[in-house]
């Protein structure tokens, strides 16, 4: 049995970025489920400041997914890079009749949960979840009509390789959309304070995401 102490050790001293990412999501799984009201979303969500704040955080998460993909042609095969537990892909595939989505992820237990979610929502004919590395995809050239990565790109050890792979696997008129977490220097005093507190509890710091 893997203990929390072992997970924390793997997170802090893990030999690879992949190990740290897997451990990070394993440790914070209960928190993400609480944040998403157990609807399997792992992203932070998107709130338009000109609108009243939604009653449910799930609404903001759905807003994020819809906003990221709003300029896509709503047909063909899409790729969800860093698909989490499958909620974004399932949400989009229910919205649009003429699309299919493949999701890739390096966190095995999330793939299992994504497949369960697809079965529960009766979407097995429209979504597929596979183990896959965003920086070294198995897909053939020009496989996808659109590719999106929602709050996952900051994990990629070599972001240039991801861009190259996205370019290789996109069809000529395909689009790539990325939602990332951006660090603002003017917030340095606040983030430096919280960085110390976060590190004490074994959570990810800015340096972990940026590769510093």
For each feature predicted by the language model, list its residue ranges.
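Conserved alpha-helix/loop element of class I SAM-dependent methyltransferases that forms part
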Residues: 55-75
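Class I SAM-dependent methyltransferase SAM/SAH-binding core
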Residues: 77-79, 85-136
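N-terminal auxiliary segments of SAM/dcSAM-dependent transferases
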Residues: 1-35
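Short alpha-helix
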Residues: 206-212
């Amino acid at each position: 049995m893997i203990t929390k102490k072992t997970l924390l050790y793997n997170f802090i001293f893990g030999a690879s970025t992949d190990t740290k990412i897997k451990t990070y999501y394993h440790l914070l799984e209960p928190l993400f489920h609480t944040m998403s009201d157990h609807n399997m979303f792992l992203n932070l969500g998107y709130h338009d400041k000109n609108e009243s704040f939604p009653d449910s955080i799930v609404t903001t998460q759905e807003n994020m997914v819809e906003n990221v993909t709003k300029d896509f042609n709503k047909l063909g095969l899409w790729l969800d890079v860093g698909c989490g537990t499958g909620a974004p892909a399932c949400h989009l595939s229910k919205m649009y009749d003429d699309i299919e989505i493949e999701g890739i992820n390096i966190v095995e237990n999330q793939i299992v949960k994504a497949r369960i979610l697809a079965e529960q929502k009766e979407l097995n004919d429209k979504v597929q979840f596979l183990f896959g590395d965003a920086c070294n995809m198995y897909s053939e050239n020009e496989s996808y009509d659109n590719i999106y990565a929602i709050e996952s790109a900051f994990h990629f050890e070599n972001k240039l390789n991801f861009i190259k792979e996205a370019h290789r696997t996109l069809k000529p008129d395909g689009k790539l959309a990325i939602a990332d977490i951006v660090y603002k220097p003017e917030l340095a005093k606040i983030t430096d304070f919280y960085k110390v507190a976060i590190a004490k509890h074994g959570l990810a710091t800015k340096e972990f995401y940026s590769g510093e």
